[in-house]
Amino acid sequence: MSSSDPKPGPKPGPWPPTPESAAMPPSSWAKKTGFRPKFSGETTATDSSSGQLSLPVRAKQQETQPDLEAGQTRLRPPPPVSAAVTNGETDKDKKEKPPPPPPGSVAVPVKDQPVKRRRDSDGVVGRSNGPDGANGSGDPVRRPGRIEETVEVLPQSMDDDLVARNLHMKYGLRDTPGLVPIGFYGLQHYLSMLGSLILVPLVIVPAMGGSHEEVANVVSTVLFVSGITTLLHTSFGSRLPLIQGPSFVFLAPALAIINSPEFQGLNGNNNFKHIMRELQGAIIIGSAFQAVLGYSGLMSLILRLVNPVVVAPTVAAVGLSFYSYGFPLVGKCLEIGVVQILLVIIFALYLRKISVLSHRIFLIYAVPLSLAITWAAAFLLTETGAYTYKGCDPNVPVSNVVSTHCRKYMTRMKYCRVDTSHALSSAPWFRFPYPLQWGVPLFNWKMAFVMCVVSVIASVDSVGSYHASSLLVASRPPTRGVVSRAIGLEGFTSVLAGLWGTGTGSTTLTENVHTIAVTKMGSRRVVELGACVLVIFSLVGKVGGFLASIPQVMVASLLCFMWAMFTALGLSNLRYSEAGSSRNIIIVGLSLFFSLSVPAYFQQYGISPNSNLSVPSYYQPYIVSSHGPFKSQYKGMNYVMNTLLSMSMVIAFIMAVILDNTVPGSKQERGVYVWSDSETATREPALAKDYELPFRVGRFFRWVKWVGI
């Protein structure tokens, strides 16, 4: 090199540190189940077994990152290498600097700079690409020497508001709107669930031979008990904004008990009271079993077997099992029933996006709007004489009609006219529902055993509703103890329903999840105010009389939609699992198929094609106890087995539980429910505020670990 050449400048320092990868949002399965794994790029590291937020810790960095959506494993980018020194460092700094490590793993410890502990994008401290440090040899490499940022935690109120905004909810679980919004949204919430509250008694009371006045009394009792049990559940149960009422889960066993052989020969005006007392006794025993299941902590063990793949076919089978009841009864008056079905479909589907003052009135009020329009049209047809035939009286029983001309039109007059019911005119203005109003309950062990099994199915249905609604309105899913506490309280409230004589148990209505998602209203106070209004309405006898006057054809038409909705809500639980997995598809398909095929075998066994049964065709699936294939020397056992195995929901539950818990599958594939744990409740005030008992009642039950937070 010549002397005229310029001297080379100082060598440039190492490359600047590469920016950390942007935080990846949780995968769809993680969002839907509340699962937060310790994978790279996710900002909230969790324990995969419990799904809870963990404190920032320094651990070894993983080399690969599982892809929850694609089920693949992809390589992590190499960790950043920070600058060792700057170009302007002094000789003193160079002397104090330790010798550099081998190429490819340069990292300089920083002693003079205070480094705050922070969580990496995956919550751990990494090492260079190799199992033992630098390409597989040497000691683990230190993190780059630069001033780290601390993890900022939002205040609790800001965190709650953020959750509510992310979920697009108008009001969260603990929000208290003004009095006017509470009243409006409370009325909206209960009107949207009108069908679920009143349709069950309109089915079972006529099946028991009850009069129009008795139908009105049972409807008022259902409103009263639903209001009381909802207040109890929002205060001492799960504390989620879930309405309690007569669940469709109890409808099939109630109809099976009503059509038992020992009740077929009853005559007189006391048929209704006698059958109701038998039904009350069975509900009380079955509900007491459910209460023991919850408060003893056994429900926490059952939760290990209950997953979305189990809940989906079980709940769906409840709605599908009533296919023989729906349209056969609608066919008694097609011009009224079909119009009712078409209107509710148009409102719920075709007009669902039409908003008035930011409220989707057609979607929210699909059932009451379609009922009001159809009822008004049927009233006009009745008043104009469309269903009036000369010399025929619709109030005369068919057995007393002599004229052949009138016999031909009696069915049409009975189901199409709207003035055949005198429930409204005969109902008193004030009536207080009281316990044991139908008499002392009668206890029969075989009917009680059937209800005990049904209470387990009702608990499974409620578990799915708890999880789905908590993801909408709460900061986290409840703990297993809270779920057990809620199931225990549902058993207690169903005992109250049995004492008051509603004909069914009082459990969480599955339609709650749909209503909360549509109305965007998750406030607990709204549901509580609506429950108080429901209790007040139940004391006005004319309200029960008005609801009891709904024609049977319209009831069947609404039930066609409600049972279809119930089936859809059950199948929607599959969104928490891998719905495209062949494992889950086969399990759900087998469960649904056999839930329809096996009961059909039991229901058709021993019935000749030419047999003339005394019960209507839509009640024939519930008389299987008298002719089922299970025959032994114990008549009570025959009744229990034939009745249970003729219920679709029981077969679906048995099939799904066995297959889901024996066929291998990952937690992600199965969509295992992720519940919060007690340790998280102590760290996060939001979780405790969401689920802790009011008035500091929980401090007296801290020793009961299995039913608390």
From Swiss-Prot:
Name the residue ranges with Pro residues bias: 7-19
Q: Which domain of life is it from?
A: Eukaryota
Membrane-topology descriptor? Multi-pass membrane protein
From start to end residue, where is composition biased (Basic and acidic residues)?
A: 89-98, 113-122
Q: Which InterPro entries match?
A: NCS2
Give residue spans, biased composition: Polar residues: 41-53
GO BP terms: namely: adenine import across plasma membrane; guanine import across plasma membrane; hypoxanthine transport; uracil import across plasma membrane
Grouped into one coarse class, the protein's main location is: membrane
Q: Which residues carry this modification: Phosphoserine?
A: S40
* UniProt protein name: Nucleobase-ascorbate transporter 12
Record organism: Arabidopsis thaliana
Upper lineage is: Eukaryota, Viridiplantae, Streptophyta, Embryophyta, Tracheophyta
Whichever gene encodes this chain, its name is NAT12
